[in-house]
């Protein structure tokens, strides 16, 4: 299991989908790194995380 991924926004922590399932989170974009597809989400508090697609 990856704990971080490298994105255009820098190295982001990987979190489960349940972590971003509130109204405070906004989907930003999809990307891949080392063959792993993930989505990037941003929170109203400034936190940015990646959610790996399963």
Q: Language-model features: where?
A:
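Acidic, low-complexity, intrinsically disordered interaction modules
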Residues: 12-54
